[in-house]
Amino acid sequence: ISIFMVSIFKKIGKVNNFCELGPGNGTLMKDLIKSLSAFLGNKINFFLFEKSNRFSVDSIFKDYKEFSVKKIKKLSFPSQPFFFFCNEFFDALPVNQFEKKNNIWFERRVKLQNNKLSLILKKNAFFTKISENSDGSILEISPLKKLYLSKIFNHLSQFGGGFLIFDYGPFSKKKIDTIQSIY
């Protein structure tokens, strides 16, 4: 990942601002700071976009005092080129899920009744035009994902930079349910 970023850095010019979306405990960012500083020196600004209070990236601030490392809660950046990257970030965002049954689209919802969770289907007229999917198909839409991508792409189109998204999920053309719940 670091080699890829350094090669992009050399190709598109000087980008001193790096932002990780959803750094969790900061493992990837720590590795990147080590690698990138060897190639680019310490005139690099690192931004950590983490919405969850459950994860702590405080060790990055202690271990790398010579770098500018900022934790941010909103996707708002200085008017400069940025390089954004994330690992499994978009998987953690909420989705609205729809299922096609008897040639009709339904929104899948979770209902709590008598202290038990159950899946219910609510008819949805929004997808009536989507006919190429067969019964049993699942569509997942994330308004928050669209908002974040729009902000990042607008920033990149105005000020330049790059964006690396990686995910280790399986590739499947089949429209399947990807929601998981861990208790």
Predicted regions and their residues:
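Conserved adenosyl
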Residues: 3-96
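Class I S-adenosyl-L-methionine
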Residues: 75-183
